[in-house]
Amino acid sequence: MMISSVLVAGVVAVSAALASKHPKQYSFKPEDAETIWNGDIPVLYDFGDSQSASYSGSWWTSSYITGTNGEQYLVISHYLDTPVFTYFRASTLNLETLDYNQFITLGNNTANSTTLDVKVGDNGIQSLTADNISQQRAYANDENVTFDITFDATSRVISNAGAGVFQFGPSITYEWGLPNCRTQGSVTDTGGKNITVDPAKSFTWYDRQWGTAAVTSGNWTWFQMHIPETSYKLSVWIIDNDVTNQFSRFATIRGDNDEFQVLPLEWKPIYDRTYQSTAADILYPLDWELDISGFGVFQLSSILDDQEIVGTTAIQTAYEGFVTFNGTVHNKKVQGYGLVEVVYSNWESL
């Protein structure tokens, strides 16, 4: 057993403390890479070409914002295009007051087939440069969630599973991300105040994913993890598929000098703290343990129970929560922050 019983016994107290005593300031810093990829590791597609809407799929951002007034926010945007529907959803979380807002809107595909410009109504994600990557924009104009964020490709790619492709339930999925992009723009708080982004203390994780067929039949949990004062960026997948009897647990870790590790892991959701979904009969855990083979052990906690984006179906609904964590990397103590995403492909089996 990779996670000891002693560790399990101590997680509840640690998790509660992390959730209730989050620091007032997190260390949000962009990277300053000159190129996003050096080409030594072969991938199966061109990053710029994959931005085209003709590939369909998912365009997603999570922006870790520090305002020029010192306030900090997590801002999420997501555009998904499927053969059945198209949606844009977004959320904002004030990391000090824990004021949370979210929305989802459905519409027809209005994407440009060659240049990245995907939107539903007055909400979307677009490229501002001809290469579809160097500079992008995410924006939302909902009654309770309003932002206009621009981010530059100043971060080296994290290519999931090493080559940017892996089995996702019954199908193949392709996924890559830019984990620490320089960010500017503005966010509007609940009171209508416009917060200007401080580019030196903010960054965006951009994620691009598309596939060949249906998603996994079960649920999936994904963690994005940042360890300040190190170069490690972690993309952690837990994927369940009862139809194929495939249960994947792996982490893609980007380190120094474009070093990639793809490692198996053990994970444990802890249900001592939970959040009851307002959309379905789902009880989300708010604490987790990860034991990444040969790398480290982590205890993660959501800082707020309700961080659900609520749709009318399972695939439209997601728990997109800011998390903090304690742990060890190669036996050295670390702390960090990131995000957890929990999605169910259907609610029929619940």
Curated annotation (Swiss-Prot):
Its main location: secreted. It comes from the Eukaryota. GO terms for cellular component: extracellular region. Induction: Up-regulated by biochanin and phaseollinisoflavan. Pfam families: Lipocalin_9. Residues 1-19 form the signal peptide. Its EC number is 4.2.1.95. One of its GO terms (molecular function) is kievitone hydratase activity. GO terms for biological process: detoxification of nitrogen compound; phytoalexin catabolic process. Keywords: Detoxification, Glycoprotein, Lyase, Secreted, Signal. InterPro entries: AttH-like_dom_sf, Fungal_Dehydratase/Hydratase. Glycosylated. It catalyses: kievitone hydrate = kievitone + H2O. It is found in: Secreted. Homodimer. PANTHER family: ATTH DOMAIN-CONTAINING PROTEIN-RELATED, TERPENE CYCLASE ASQC. Converts fungitoxic kievitone to the less toxic kievitone hydrate, and thereby protects the pathogenic fungus against this phytoalexin. This is Kievitone hydratase. It comes from Fusarium solani subsp. phaseoli (Nectria haematococca).
